[in-house]
C-alpha cells in the first residue's frame, strides 16, 4: 500500500505528459520516415500494419462503452467510434486510411485482407483490445492518453512526407489532417476522466504504468516492422521467403 500523498492534478498531468519521452515518434523507424530515409517498402509496410491498429480502435472503444455505466461519458465517447467507422452515409478514419494505402501504392483489398500484418503487430494490437475489454472503463479510457502526443506525430508527417516522398498521392494525407483536431478533442475528454478518477498516489502510479503499457504497444509494433522492413528479417526469414504466418484466428 502506498501511503504517499497523491500528486495534485497539475503534478499528475505533468507526470503523464512526461511519458511523451517514450512515445513512438522517437522510434528509429518513425525518425527514418520523418527524415526521408524510409524506402517505399518501409512506408508501405508501416501503412499496411498500422491498418490493423486502425480497424481495432473501434473495437477498443466499443469495449469501453460496454463497460461504462455513465450515460454522459458514453454519449461523448461514442464519437470516437463514429470518427473511425464513420457515421451513416459518411466515411470515417478507416476509409481515410484505405485511401492512404492507395496513395502509397497498396491495394485496398490487400489491406482489408490483413495478409501483410506481422505477428508482432497483431499481438500488440490484440493485447490492447483485450486490455480494454478486461480493465475498468476508466482504466481503458485513460490508456488512450497517448493521444496527448498524437498531434505532434500527425503534424510531423504532414510537414515532412510531401517533401521527402513525392511519389505519395497528397490525397492520402487526409487522415492525418483530420486526426489533428480529433485527437486534441479526445485528449480533453480522456484527460478529464483520468484526473478525476486517479486521486490516490497508488492509483496515479497504476495509471502511469497503464500509459507505459500503451507506449510499449506502439513501440513494439515498430520493433516488429524494423525487423521485417529495415533488417530484412521478417518471421521465418531463415527458412522461407513466403509470408507463412497466421492471418488472424477468429474466436
UniProtKB/Swiss-Prot annotation:
Signal peptide: none annotated. Pathway: Cofactor biosynthesis; pyrroloquinoline quinone biosynthesis. GO terms for molecular function: pyrroloquinoline-quinone synthase activity. It catalyses: 6-(2-amino-2-carboxyethyl)-7,8-dioxo-1,2,3,4,7,8-hexahydroquinoline-2,4-dicarboxylate + 3 O2 = pyrroloquinoline quinone + 2 H2O2 + 2 H2O + H(+). Keywords: Oxidoreductase, PQQ biosynthesis. Belongs to the PqqC family. This is Pyrroloquinoline-quinone synthase.
Amino acid at each position: 500500500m502506498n501511503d504517499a500523498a497523491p500528486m495534485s492534478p497539475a503534478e499528475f498531468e505533468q507526470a503523464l505528459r512526461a511519458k511523451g519521452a517514450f512515445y513512438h515518434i522517437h522510434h528509429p523507424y518513425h525518425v527514418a520516415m520523418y527524415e526521408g530515409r524510409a524506402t517505399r517498402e518501409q512506408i508501405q509496410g508501416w501503412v499496411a500494419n498500422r491498418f490493423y491498429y486502425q480497424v481495432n480502435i473501434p473495437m477498443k472503444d466499443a469495449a469501453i462503452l460496454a463497460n461504462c455505466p455513465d450515460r454522459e461519458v458514453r454519449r461523448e465517447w461514442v464519437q470516437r467510434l463514429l470518427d473511425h467507422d464513420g457515421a451513416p452515409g459518411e466515411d470515417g478514419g478507416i476509409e481515410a486510411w484505405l485511401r492512404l494505402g492507395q496513395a502509397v501504392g497498396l491495394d485496398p483489398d490487400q489491406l482489408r485482407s490483413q495478409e501483410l500484418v506481422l505477428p508482432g503487430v497483431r499481438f500488440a494490437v490484440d493485447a490492447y483490445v483485450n486490455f480494454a475489454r478486461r480493465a475498468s472503463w476508466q482504466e481503458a479510457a485513460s490508456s488512450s492518453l497517448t493521444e496527448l502526443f498524437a498531434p505532434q506525430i500527425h503534424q510531423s508527417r504532414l510537414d515532412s512526407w510531401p517533401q521527402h516522398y513525392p511519389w505519395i498521392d497528397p490525397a492520402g494525407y487526409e487522415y492525418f489532417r483530420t486526426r489533428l483536431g480529433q485527437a486534441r478533442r479526445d485528449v480533453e475528454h480522456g484527460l478529464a476522466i483520468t484526473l478525476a478518477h486517479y486521486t490516490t498516489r497508488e492509483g496515479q502510479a497504476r495509471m502511469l504504468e497503464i500509459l507505459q503499457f500503451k507506449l510499449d504497444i506502439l513501440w513494439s509494433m515498430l520493433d516488429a516492422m524494423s525487423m521485417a522492413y529495415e533488417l530484412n528479417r521478417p518471421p521465418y526469414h531463415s527458412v522461407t521467403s513466403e509470408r507463412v504466418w497466421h492471418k488472424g484466428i477468429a474466436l
